[in-house]
């Protein structure tokens, strides 16, 4: 229990208002907080979620020999104001929290046994530290393979995977009950609809758990195969549950076990191969010949077909030359750029021209995809022309400007790793004009008239502030310093970014 309290303390800043009860051990309740995510919207249940209602429901479950709430012919509601689907949602959310505890606490339990909590907390790293890893390693590699994790997987296989580390028979009965209930209710688990159900808005935690369970199983086998081909020491980064809370840098030999947890980012490092997984996609990069990486390609295909009964065509895994193709990763387009330079060398009376080729990781901002994301959020149209934000017109002027400024700063903060920042100027232009049009809409005037009336007021001064000035606020160096200008033109990877940009999630 002390370990669990420590977990709550570390995540208190990310807590939600929803309380999840654990009802598998008599009447002892544990409350799990900190399950907030930028990927998953919180479910409010129409503000009717009550711990008292849950307690009454648990008591009723202990007294009954069957689940009345799952009966198809039962439309009666034993409690006022709540329907049967509400009961199923409560039980399902509690069920997911129970099975996720083993995953979410594994890192902290292992840290508490060997280290202090504070020391473990200080080892947290930013998402942006992944890109310096790429800068150091990708320039020496030549092949990249994009792997799309295939769906669907049979539900009974998921149950068999869980049997390795859960021995409670009633647990599997309850799991099959959920499968049967949601299959009959919405027919969710048909192959055509399986992909969308993994991140269903109605039950995101449940489907995220199933997805990570499946990926954890195949990656543990992949680690085993990789260790058979190399005995070198491994370094890898890890993140919980596709939710991008944080990740911790670990340096140790990986122990392959079916009990290993599923992580979003995993780097298996040796001289020849690197592996990265994020969302539903994996990247495999290598310095070896195409025959070698093609061998790994068929390893994955046979693994999915023989172990998980998933049919995956070879065309779903693409092998590309890094020097000729770019790939998408966490909101960036990454590619290897060749810089050519000519050096003149003279030896005695003879002179030579030496052509030098240097490789450099090129990080490009996907401006078209970002404009598409801004269009979905109603900041502009599909052509990139700014429009007003009507839903914010009822806010105060300060709140409207503050929201636009926060979005603009987040863009610059997240994409400062790109050496070509001209694309960000277009994003700033869209947000600035959208802010002006929203303010003009609120005051019932045109954008031109509103700007003229604004006159000498400095309401939008921060939007017109040069990026060098903002950068100088971050680094206390004189504005005229050549160091500031040089740093600004180069890449800046911030080590305080624990979440992806909200607009990156739509790319």
Swiss-Prot record:
Protein keywords: Chloroplast, mRNA processing, Plastid, RNA-binding, tRNA processing
Principal location listed in the UniProt entry: plastid
GO BP terms, alphabetized: mRNA processing; RNA splicing; tRNA processing
Location(s), subcellular: Plastid, Chloroplast
UniProt xrefs under Pfam families: Intron_maturas2, MatK_N
Molecular function (Gene Ontology), one example: RNA binding
CC per GO annotation: chloroplast
InterPro entries to which the protein is assigned, alphabetical: Domain_X, Maturase_MatK, Maturase_MatK_N
Function: Usually encoded in the trnK tRNA gene intron. Probably assists in splicing its own and other chloroplast group II introns.
PANTHER family with a match to the protein in the record: MATURASE K (PTHR34811:SF1)
Record's protein name: Maturase K
Organism: Amphicarpaea bracteata
